[in-house]
Regions:
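Binding-site signature for planar aromatic cofactors or substrates
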Residues: 1-123
Length: 123
């Protein structure tokens, strides 16, 4: 793949804030809209999930997941020409008491300051 498409995908990941998270439970697919923050080097993606959410429960049972990041529909005739990237991987929980939590929280709030309320909730 040429450098130009890599740069376009990196820009797509860095400039968007929401994506579709896909998880599997008991062989059944489930999707949810989530907000995310990317690692500076794009080596990982942070998603803040409530313990009350079905998708967090599903990820704790089966961490295999994918994240679809897509540019917004702008009304163009060929909808399939919208830029998109699908990231596949395994989710890992960052515990509130863990050493990585303060930095992860700071990165998340730097991009999504409106999430401060979510971080203040006990779940």
């Amino acid at each position: 793949m040429a450098t130009e498409p890599h740069a376009a995908l990196a820009e797509l990941i860095r400039t968007h804030r929401q994506a579709t998270l896909a998880v599997v439970e008991a062989g059944q697919p489930y999707t949810a809209m989530v907000s995310y923050v990317e690692a500076p080097d794009l080596s990982g993606i942070l998603i803040h999930l409530s313990s009350l959410s079905a998708h967090k429960r599903m990820l704790l049972g089966n961490p295999v997941c994918s994240l679809l990041i897509c540019e917004p529909d702008d009304g163009r005739a060929e909808v399939m020409s919208l830029a998109r990237v699908n990231v596949q991987g395994r989710a890992a929980l960052i515990e509130r008491a863990g050493a990585d939590y303060p930095q992860a929280k700071a990165r998340f709030l730097a991009k999504l300051p409106s999430a401060a309320l979510m971080f203040s909730l006990p779940d």
